[in-house]
């Protein structure tokens, strides 16, 4: 099950030896609807957090991690080390998020 894939931002996992399988990533691109964009535009005028976009980014990160786990499992990995995020905007209302790292297989 992909949920059992350990994901860490560190290079080493205490007490574990492993062999490197290779790079894996999970990618998602999300957008908000027109009504959310109007609300964000109004919030931009008065200042403050744009909750709809914060929620979208949180959801995007969770989806990217889920896909990263799936890719690591397909590659035969037990864990992903050195996990990182990257994100970028596509147009005015779309956000792309990638989670990437190195899939590894534990040695017995």
UniProtKB/Swiss-Prot annotation:
Pfam families: YbjQ_1
InterPro entries: UPF0145_dom_sf, UPF0145_YbjQ-like
HAMAP family: UPF0145 (MF_00338)
Record-stated family: Belongs to the UPF0145 family.
Name of the protein this chain belongs to: UPF0145 protein LSEI_0651
Organism: Lacticaseibacillus paracasei (strain ATCC 334 / BCRC 17002 / CCUG 31169 / CIP 107868 / KCTC 3260 / NRRL B-441) (Lactobacillus paracasei)
């Amino acid at each position: 099950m992909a949920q059992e894939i350990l994901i860490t931002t560190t290079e080493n996992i205490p007490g574990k030896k492993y062999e490197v399988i290779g790079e894996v990533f999970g990618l998602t691109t999300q957008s908000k609807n027109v009504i959310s964009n109007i609300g964000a535009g109004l919030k931009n005028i008065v200042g403050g957090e744009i909750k709809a976009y914060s929620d979208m980014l949180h959801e995007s990160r969770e989806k990217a991690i889920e896909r990263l786990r799936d890719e690591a499992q397909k590659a035969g990995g037990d864990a992903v080390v050195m996990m990182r995020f990257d994100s970028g905007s596509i147009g005015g209302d779309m956000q792309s998020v990638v989670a990437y790292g190195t899939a590894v297989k534990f040695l017995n």
